[in-house]
Amino acid sequence: MSFYGQMVGEDESGYLPSANMFLGGVEGHHGWGKDAVNWYVEAHDTRTNMSRTNYSYTHHIYKDGYYQQGYPLGDAMGGDGQLIAGKVELITEDNQRWSTRLVYAKVNPEDQSINKAFPHADTLKGVQLGWSGDVYQSVRLNTSLWYTNANNSDSDDVGASAGIEIPFSL
């Protein structure tokens, strides 16, 4: 089991970062018979010091703050958000990977117009299911299905994806 974290300071006070944002998590990798299980639980908080809004991702001099053309440069949810996510992945003996990921997030609580990723305050609840496996020698197929419920949006997000990994050596 591992613990990890990140603290980003928007300002400096006494030679140390202040006005901090946080990311933290715990992950595990375990054997389960001939299979393996990987998992993690992670939390993000892009409010300043876990409470102050309209500060870390904005700036009175640099008007774009921590955004580039309206999209967040750091955490994808942008400033003043809170997120908790968890994932469990089963890796079988024949190298198939089955996974489930759950997400709960509160984004843009102050309706900041700069945040084009999430232009309005919203609460998101999502689930993602995945499978990947070797389909020909070392060629791998990755698939995913997801659904995200948005409380304050006209539409929820539903999708599917597929990708192929083809290894090569240089």
Question: What annotation goes with each model-predicted range?
Answer:
Residues 1-170:
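Exposed, low-structure sequence patches enriched in small/polar residues
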